[in-house]
């Protein structure tokens, strides 16, 4: 392989924005923040849980005058 043309493959931490779970791995991308991970995603947990990291649900409810149930 040629020297100096490949990206650095180093330790990285992927952090979940929903549950603050940290996944240690190796990557060329560096540290990343994920919106949702396998620890809190409803498909993997089997639980229906509303994850709203950007306030979209509240904005929708205010816009259409909906109440929490």
UniProtKB/Swiss-Prot annotation:
One GO process term, biological-process aspect: translation
Any one Gene Ontology cellular component term annotated for this protein: ribosome
Keyword Electron transport: no
Pfam families the record matches: Ribosomal_L31
Keyword terms, alphabetized: Ribonucleoprotein, Ribosomal protein, RNA-binding, rRNA-binding
InterPro entries in UniProt: Ribosomal_bL28/bL31-like_sf, Ribosomal_bL31, Ribosomal_bL31_A, Ribosomal_bL31_sf
Highest taxon of source: Bacteria
Molecular functions (GO terms): rRNA binding; structural constituent of ribosome
HAMAP family hit by this protein: Ribosomal_bL31_1
Subunit structure: Part of the 50S ribosomal subunit.
Family: Belongs to the bacterial ribosomal protein bL31 family. Type A subfamily.
Free-text function comment from the UniProt entry: Binds the 23S rRNA.
Protein name: Large ribosomal subunit protein bL31
């Amino acid at each position: 392989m040629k020297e100096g043309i490949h990206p650095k493959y180093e330790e990285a931490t992927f952090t979940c924005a929903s549950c603050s779970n940290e996944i240690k791995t190796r990557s060329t991308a560096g540290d990343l923040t994920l919106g949702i991970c396998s620890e809190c995603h409803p498909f993997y947990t089997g639980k229906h849980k509303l994850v709203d990291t950007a306030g979209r649900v509240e904005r929708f409810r205010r816009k259409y005058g909906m109440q929490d149930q």
